[in-house]
Amino acid sequence: MHDRTFHIETFGCQMNVNDSDWLARALMERGFSPAPFGEARLTIVNTCSVRDKPEQKVYSLLGRIRQATGKKPDAFVAVGGCVAQQIGSGFFSRFPQVRLVFGTDGLAMAPQALDRLVEEPDLKLSLLDFSEDYPERDAVLGQGAVPASVFVNIMQGCDNFCAYCIVPYTRGRQKSRATGTILDECRALLDRGAREITLLGQNVNSFGQDSHGDGTTFAQLLHKVAALPGLERLRFVTPHPKDIAPEVVEAFGTLPNLCPRLHLPLQAGSDRILKLMGRRYDMARYLRIVDDLRAARPDIVLSSDIIVGFPGETEEDFMETMGALETVGYAASYSFCYSDRPGTRAEMLPDKLSREVKLERLERLQTLQNRLTERCLQDMVGKKVEVLLEGMSRKPGDEGDSWQGRDPYGNLVNVALPQGSDVRGRFLPVVVAQAKKHSLLAEQAGAPW
């Protein structure tokens, strides 16, 4: 029998992580078994091309895979995700050990393709075409209970074509899943032990409004999912500020299980740069959304994405972004230096900034964000919250076991419990005792449930 061991390396966003989790379960249902890096016959690399750095890491990883598996003559590699969609069959000539290249829509057929490749060692395949409809996958939940916190894709692709972004080219145009299919998957996960669901999409606000949708709005979907029996917490990522509907804002005040944390990407605080980016909102519009969210849910916590050093960004533009961070008071922001992405409008813009200027501005912005994050965490001290426990902490407690999980605001919380406690996937009432740099320490304040 042929060796059917596999190992998956994942780069990029939560959608990629979710894709890799599904692929692993699908392969195990087909008789494959996971193995450590360098020991598996099949290594799958799920790639990201949103920025240049993850893309370069992929090429470096492929070189390390070749070294690690050099003594296994039948070892081979499958490359999937956004870089695979972008480079395509070019991987075959550059990296001879690559035998499958699958794009973002091709993921659904990857398990069948890998079955063939294991049995036919001279075969190479590519799955790079975009499908007309959402590329629905086989329902694969694996054996036993699922994690307490799970992710559900509700759409694929994006129609926004922001000037800097390669996603519409690598994940295709927007395609919404059928509402009934989404609800069926959510019910199945809840039946298997899930208690928190995060809905995933490139632009969740426009769910259902493309030609592939069934007319259900995102706000309506939120209400349908929130009403499912057994769902204790609901989250979603990622909305686009230009599309966020009043009904979605209102949901934060009317749905008790919709968590009071929202990732609302700003990208830049300068109206001039926002226009160059093609974001189709200005700071006044963005701040009105923030005010409306806080009116609907006063304790809501916000996070953001920020691009530093977009072509033509002046010091004045950058200081407007710094001011926006302070005005909104983000609990966290994911900030990066701008990098050209092939085929995007921004690649052709003049007035590119030097690497030194971009790095200097990024350091200033992250220093400010660290201060804002510490302030937000400090504000949690003394508050009682429910923590969904995900597993043991890396560092054991002084007495007993140390567990960690997330509160409704998305904060990482560590709490000491009696040794031998079996509380994975359960909620625990705690009182926050101390704020650390990026997490909280808490004390048990009730029985787990």
From Swiss-Prot:
It is an enzyme of class 2 (transferase). It catalyses: N(6)-dimethylallyladenosine(37) in tRNA + (sulfur carrier)-SH + AH2 + 2 S-adenosyl-L-methionine = 2-methylsulfanyl-N(6)-dimethylallyladenosine(37) in tRNA + (sulfur carrier)-H + 5'-deoxyadenosine + L-methionine + A + S-adenosyl-L-homocysteine + 2 H(+). Its cofactor is [4Fe-4S] cluster. Residues 378-446 form the TRAM domain. InterPro entries: Elp3/MiaA/NifB-like_rSAM, Methylthiotransferase, Methylthiotransferase_CS, Methylthiotransferase_N, Methylthiotransferase_N_sf, MiaB_methiolase, rSAM, rSAM_horseshoe. Disulfide bonds: none annotated. GO terms for cellular component: cytosol. Residues 144-375 form the Radical SAM core domain. The keyword Hydrolase does not apply. Its main location: cytoplasm. Gene3D superfamilies: Methylthiotransferase, N-terminal domain, tm_1862 like domain. One of its GO terms (molecular function) is metal ion binding. Binds 2 [4Fe-4S] clusters. One cluster is coordinated with 3 cysteines and an exchangeable S-adenosyl-L-methionine. The keyword Cell membrane does not apply. [4Fe-4S] cluster 2 binds at C158, C162, C165. Signal peptide: none annotated. [4Fe-4S] cluster 1 binds at C13, C48, C82. It is found in: Cytoplasm. Catalyzes the methylthiolation of N6-(dimethylallyl)adenosine (i(6)A), leading to the formation of 2-methylthio-N6-(dimethylallyl)adenosine (ms(2)i(6)A) at position 37 in tRNAs that read codons beginning with uridine. NCBIfam families: miaB-methiolase, MiaB/RimO family radical SAM methylthiotransferase. Belongs to the methylthiotransferase family. MiaB subfamily. Monomer. PANTHER family: CDK5 REGULATORY SUBUNIT-ASSOCIATED PROTEIN 1, MITOCHONDRIAL TRNA METHYLTHIOTRANSFERASE CDK5RAP1. This is tRNA-2-methylthio-N(6)-dimethylallyladenosine synthase. It comes from Nitratidesulfovibrio vulgaris (strain DP4) (Desulfovibrio vulgaris).
